[in-house]
Amino acid sequence: MSDPAFPPQAGSTRKKVAFFKQGAFSYTNVRTAEQIRACFPGYEVEEFDVLGDMVHRRPLVRALSIAHTVRLYGRRLLWQRLPLSQASFRTPYLFHRLHELICEHFAPRVHEFAFTFQTQSLFDASIPGVPHFVYTDHTHLANAHYPGFPADELFPQSWVKLEREIYQNARHIFVMSDHVRTSLHDDYGVENSRTSTVNAGSNIDTTPAPLENDGFRNRTIVFIGLDWERKGGPTLLAAFERLRADVPDARLVILGCQPAGLPPGCEAHGRVSREEVKRWLARASLLCLPTRVEPFGIAVVEAFAHRLPVVVSNIGAMPGIVHQGESGLLVPPDDPVALAAALRELITDPEKCQRFGEAGHAHVCKHYTWEAVGAKIRAGIEATLRTPAGA
């Protein structure tokens, strides 16, 4: 049976959208939900947090989830410091139990929903009889394409099989970057006609504010990231020490984490508010993100929104966001010598910093705003719902 026309015909009861999420997703869930509401103003959007609404309210489900996670990933939890919260979403138990609970909860009201929509590909929120859409920044197997990614850090094939079900049950999949779209096709066999790259926007207020960086002469570098190792923090410290040998007044500000043993010229502030991130960006001369794994990198979009140049790794989504030699510099991951040279090239050239920052700002204003993302998602949903399922 084909899906209903979009928008619903007069008299149709399909006037709701179910929006499924897991936690905050670095504030992306808030921005995405705002766009779903803005782009579908005639629809009531019901938000549903699978963790808070399904797991935390059911002590037995939570206890069994922990037990299954420890049984499946016990050694990795202990030796690789794999976070329990991350591993629990990669167990067959929680995957199937969440899908059962979602279907049971919504079964009596299936007729009320025009479509369902989920962010991230960690669970399957599809409901039989309702068109389903996914918006994600990653696939798990995309990790295997990063240089030097340890094979023993990949989740087992049992999880990949479940992840593949998420994509099979979606009418259309929206992704933040082309490298994820490529992975969907090459690693999961998803036809390109069922995927769209829609990018993402900034998760902090980007209202224009004057920069306080002495015309890019204060030589302040900002790093933003919660996962110090994954974001290339140790490589950045090694590069920064090399940089300081030539540029002794260079300064490194670390936001999001608080590593120990920092050399002179470095300061770490740990987790800070979005407003504090904005203030630090306004005081910086550039952003550096020498990440080892990067599904998207919203921090780069936020830096460009503040007219800052960037130095980032040439992996994942980065080459699609940063134009080499125009808005920033791309370097290989885990290469402190190349990173130090790139930092030196920009931090000692205020005019180039300003020129790159303006180019990055123009690029994100055109392609990386939440309004642009919402418009692309709406267009994709409209086109999909006008096409019979399976056509």
Label every model-predicted segment.
Residues 292:
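Aromatic "clamp/platform" in nucleotide-sugar-dependent glycosyltransferases that forms part
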Residues 309-312, 322:
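Short hydrophobic beta-strand element within catalytic cores of glycosyltransferases
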Residues 287-288:
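A short hydrophobic beta-strand element within the catalytic core of glycosyltransferases
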Residues 179, 201:
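Carbohydrate-associated surface elements
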